[in-house]
Amino acid sequence: PGPRSGVRASAMKRSLYDWDEGAYLTQEEERVIDELEAMLRPPALTMAPYPAKSIVLASGEVMVVREATIDEVDTLLKIIQPLAWLDRDYYDIVSARLFAELLAWKKYRVRNEYCLVGVIDGVLAGIVNGRMFDEGHGVSYHTLSLKRGLRVGAHLFASKMEHHIEYLGQDEVWIVAESPIGHRRWMIEYPLDKKFEVQHELGGAPSWVLSRETYFKAKSRLVSGTRPVPAELLARSKPILEPDLSTMLVQIEDTLEARL
């Protein structure tokens, strides 16, 4: 059933519609829903912003790394969703989980989440996300590279660690990998310490940890970027544009073949 006849357009815009009952909610019913929504949303800590930076890639292209906003989540979801069916290098599970995490952020069903994006001439090149567990501990969620062969994922992961340690001021970050490449990139390259007594949120896998000490030892090798980003360059990172899907899939296949 649709909205009842005789209801003004202005009322339709203001009121919530109960499709099961075939009627608009009363003001009292809407008030109860608002109260329930407030109860369902997790409490949030104040989070310091991540200052945008630019990174010159091996190709000579310049990637802007900046925080994404909740208003950009729908765009990110449209780009991520097709990759959930790509059974290569764990793109399927990483994309599916990242999709759910970003949707939960948009719907206020996750505590203290953030998302950083890498953008080249407006086109999305990669995404990383995570959250604050508490003021001293961070949780790394996912790193998804849409442009392979230029260490986009490695640069974005390093930016994520920079955010946790330097801007959120945390003592350590809990990390797991879902692919052998991820294990090599994070656990070995930094290197990370074992903290297997901590079950990670991603399926309860044993956690590895990046401490402040390890981060600052690795920073000169692994953390890149220049600040501030020129206003014109930063402006070109918005709105986020979708990469060509066919080109992206071919590139992913080619880089995997080169590693085999």
Give, region by region, the residue ranges found by the protein language model.
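Short acidic N-proximal helix/loop "leader" segments that mark the beginning
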Residues: 13-59
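A short beta-loop-alpha structural element at the N-terminal edge
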Residues: 62-78
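Conserved acetyl-CoA-binding loop-helix of GNAT-fold acetyltransferases
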Residues: 150-165
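Conserved beta-strand-loop-alpha-helix junction that forms the acyl-donor binding cleft
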Residues: 173-188
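Conserved catalytic-core motifs of GNAT/GCN5-like acyltransferases
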Residues: 176-177, 192-211
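Short, cationic low-complexity segments
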Residues: 222-254
